[in-house]
Structures are given as C-alpha cells and as structure tokens.
C-alpha cells in the first residue's frame, strides 16, 4: 500500500458509497470509484467480532490489497469485512477478492 493513501474525511466515504461501484464477495464487500486519486479504506464493523478479530481481518485485507496494488487502476477503494471472513482461508479470500476486482473492472 505504498502508493495508496488512506481516506481522511467522511465525505470521501460518502461519495464512494453513493457514486461508486459495489460488489459482494465471500467474506468482503468491495466499493470502487474511478478517480485520479489513489486511496484505500479497510473497514470491519463490530459484527465481525471483538477487536482482535476485527484487526486481524483488516490486516488480512490490507495484505491482499498490497498483492494486487500494482495491477489496479487509480481510484478509491473501500473493503468492508463480513463476519464470515474469519472462517475463510487466506488463499480462498485472495481468490474471492481477485474475482471481485475483476468484476468491478479495476485491473489495468
């Protein structure tokens, strides 16, 4: 995630939620808004679990994003962890995330 910045305001989240594309995958929901900026946010609500579980889920999603980062178009990305993320293996999550990003046409 060297090239991507974090979201800084609620307005950025709102704009991506309202205008951006959305795709549900197993374990994660992906929001994407094509933009000249490169920004990312990883979210895990309390439905996912306690703090340790939420933080682990976010770390996993950031690691997967770092794997695909160089192949992705510029834009704003939001990854929302679902509660079933804890039951999936890393390789299964990687496959699901790659499939979802392809469906949103995020790859260069």
From Swiss-Prot:
Q: Summarize the protein's role.
A: RNaseP catalyzes the removal of the 5'-leader sequence from pre-tRNA to produce the mature 5'-terminus. It can also cleave other RNA substrates such as 4.5S RNA. The protein component plays an auxiliary but essential role in vivo by binding to the 5'-leader sequence and broadening the substrate specificity of the ribozyme.
Q: Which HAMAP family match?
A: RNase_P (MF_00227)
| Family annotation (NCBIfam families) | rnpA
Q: What Gene3D superfamilies does UniProt report for this protein, alphabetically?
A: 3.30.230.10
Task: Return one Gene Ontology term, BP aspect.
Answer: tRNA 5'-leader removal
> Do the record's keywords include tRNA processing?
yes
PANTHER family referenced in this protein's UniProt entry, alphabetically: RIBONUCLEASE P PROTEIN COMPONENT (PTHR33992:SF1)
Alphabetically list the UniProt keywords. Answer: Endonuclease, Hydrolase, Nuclease, RNA-binding, tRNA processing
The reaction(s) catalysed by this protein are: Endonucleolytic cleavage of RNA, removing 5'-extranucleotides from tRNA precursor
Q: What class of enzyme is it?
A: hydrolase
Protein name, as recorded: Ribonuclease P protein component
The record's comment on protein family reads: Belongs to the RnpA family.
- Extract the GO molecular function terms from the UniProt entry: 3'-tRNA processing endoribonuclease activity; ribonuclease P activity; tRNA binding
* EC assignment: 3.1.26.5
Could you state one GO cellular component term attached to this entry? ribonuclease P complex
Which superkingdom, per the lineage?
Bacteria
InterPro entries (UniProt xref): Ribosomal_Su5_D2-typ_SF, Ribsml_uS5_D2-typ_fold_subgr, RNase_P, RNase_P_CS
Whether Repressor counts among this entry's keywords is: no
Q: How does it assemble?
A: Consists of a catalytic RNA component (M1 or rnpB) and a protein subunit.
């Amino acid at each position: 995630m060297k090239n991507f910045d974090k979201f800084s305001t609620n307005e950025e989240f709102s704009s991506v939620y309202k205008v951006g594309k959305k795709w549900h995958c197993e374990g994660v929901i992906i929001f994407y808004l094509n933009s000249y900026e490169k920004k990312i946010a990883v979210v895990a609500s309390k439905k996912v679990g306690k703090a340790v579980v939420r933080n682990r889920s976010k770390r996993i999603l950031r690691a997967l994003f770092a794997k695909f980062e160089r192949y992705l178009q510029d834009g704003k990305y939001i990854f929302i962890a679902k509660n079933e993320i804890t039951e999936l293996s890393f390789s299964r999550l990687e496959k699901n995330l790659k499939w979802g990003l392809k469906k949103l046409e995020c790859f260069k």
